[in-house]
Structure formats: structure tokens, C-alpha cells
Amino acid sequence: MRPSAISADVLFEEFRSSLRWEWVAGLGASERRFDEMAVRSARSGADLVGYLNYIHPYRLQVLGEREIAYLSNATPQDCQRRVARIVTLEPPVLVLADGQTAPEALLSMCERAHIPMFSTREQSAFVIDVLRAYLAKHFADRTTMHGVFMDILGMGVLITGESGLGKSELGLELVTRGNGLVADDAVDLYRINQTTIEGKCPELLQNLLEVRGIGLLDIRAIFGETAVRRKMRLKLIVHLVRKETMEREYERLPAEPLTQDVLGVPVRKVVIQVVAGRNIAVLVEAAVRNAILQLRGIDTYQEFVQRHRRAMERGDTF
């Protein structure tokens, strides 16, 4: 799922301070938006912004020093024709960067065609980088999953499982062990590129953890600023199951690593059985450490299989 296209006035207000831009033309087109077909067909929101280019319609066009020179340094007829061609691109917004002054023909065209134009003294490359990062996030595929999302040993870990298995209590214990809370109960997940999922907490639930019998806890107020995180990249899913589910649906030693599809991206997954007396927090941290080793190319299970094969070839007995 992707959100609806963003309007010119929302984009302007979002970066009014950071890009220090002014609205210099097309003031009556504040509701102008990105083309919906262009948004759906774009591989990423980053594809929706770039330097002035006549073969890429429907995207936010940035005009720096070279682009303004191209529009200005020609015969009056050629300059008029080059400016007029911009209308055929149907840009949602034009951004004048590098402290350039817009040619009168460009200003007039924006007013006639109802195209918003912003002006900033920031470098054009910087403007493009900022807008690409913002649009990539804004138009990213997204979903919401139930669970506790945490920073455990520097890795983004989503703890999932049936209701009543103690996910929030586990999250609280992990916080006391020096880890950080991102979100409890509802986790907003975004695919920010082809291989990366980023998660954060809905604003309404920020810093909150619900523990049955106690109620809502403000983790930031109780444990301090370092006990919470604003966002993390999802690298591991820890799924809690009951004993009967573990015995019925999962192998004790799976031959291949488990993964779960999240927004089209396979995410590593481990399954932990919840029974009385087990220290689940220690098991979760051990699973995270093992996942870190696997990311570094160290697979304990495969090393054991190779060790076992060599022993069999030597004829060793066990």
C-alpha cells in the first residue's frame, strides 16, 4: 500500500525552514500533486525528482545554474520554445536552486500553466538529495504488524507471537538489559528500497509499553532517553510459540534458515518456544548474536554439518 500523492503546499511547508525556499510563482496551484500513474510506476519515490529533463515527465524538476543557462542563453524564439516545453512535462513543482533568478518567460509560464515554483539558495545537488530521501520514504510501500519492535544489540528485531505469550513483558525485560524500545503492539513498517524494511512507532503510541496487570508504561520517562529508539531497520523476526505449536509446525534443527516475507523482502526469522522456566530474554539475545554471526558469514549449523561429514568420512564413532 502506498499513500496518496503529496500536494505542493504540504511539500513547501515540510521544507520551508530546512531548504529556506520561497514560493515565487504558481501560488494558485497549491493543491497540485504528483501524477498518480507516475507514482505507481516509479520504482521508488526517488525517481520522482531530478534535474530538468525533457524525457522524464511528471516528476519534480530542479533547475540549477546549468538549467537556467540552457533556458536563457539562446535566441528569444529558442528560449521561449524551451520554456514552453516544460509545460508538456506536467511537473508537480519546479524548484529553482543555486540562488538563480528565474527568467521572466519561466515565471509567466508557471502562472499561466498553474505550476508552483519554489526558489532556494541551496545547492541543486543538495536539494535533490533531500527531496529524494523524503519522497522515497513518503511513497514507500508500507504495512502495520502486531508485535514489539526493538533495538537488540544494535539490530532491529520484531518480536511476534500469539496474544498472551508475554511479548510486552519480554520487551520490558530486554529494556532492563540495556536494549531499546521502538514500538509496542503496532509497528509501522516501510520498504525504503528493494532490500530494506524500516520500522517505527505510530505517533500515538510513542515510548509506550503495555504490560498486563500494570498498564501503560512510559519507557522514556522511566528508563531514560537511551531506552527508546525513533526507528530501526528490520533485520530479524523472533516468533514466540507455545509448546504444542512448536512440536506440530517446526523442526527442531531446520536445515535451511527460516525467513518471513515482509513487503516483498525476505526477513530472517527464528522461532522460540515459550514454556515456564525458560529465560526468553537470554534466548532472544542469543538468537540475535547468532544472526549477527550469520550476516558475517559464520553459520554454526552448516559448520556442524561439515564437521559431522568429515567425521563420517574418517569412520569416527560417536
UniProtKB/Swiss-Prot annotation:
GO terms for biological process: regulation of carbohydrate metabolic process. Keywords: ATP-binding, Kinase, Magnesium, Metal-binding, Multifunctional enzyme, Nucleotide-binding, Serine/threonine-protein kinase, Transferase. It catalyses: [HPr protein]-L-serine + ATP = [HPr protein]-O-phospho-L-serine + ADP + H(+); [HPr protein]-O-phospho-L-serine + phosphate + H(+) = [HPr protein]-L-serine + diphosphate. The keyword Isomerase does not apply. Its cofactor is Mg(2+). The active site is at H146, K167, D185, R252. Both phosphorylation and phosphorolysis are carried out by the same active site and suggest a common mechanism for both reactions. The Walker A ATP-binding motif also binds Pi and PPi. Homohexamer. This is HPr kinase/phosphorylase. The lineage of its organism: Bacteria, Pseudomonadati, Pseudomonadota, Betaproteobacteria, Burkholderiales.
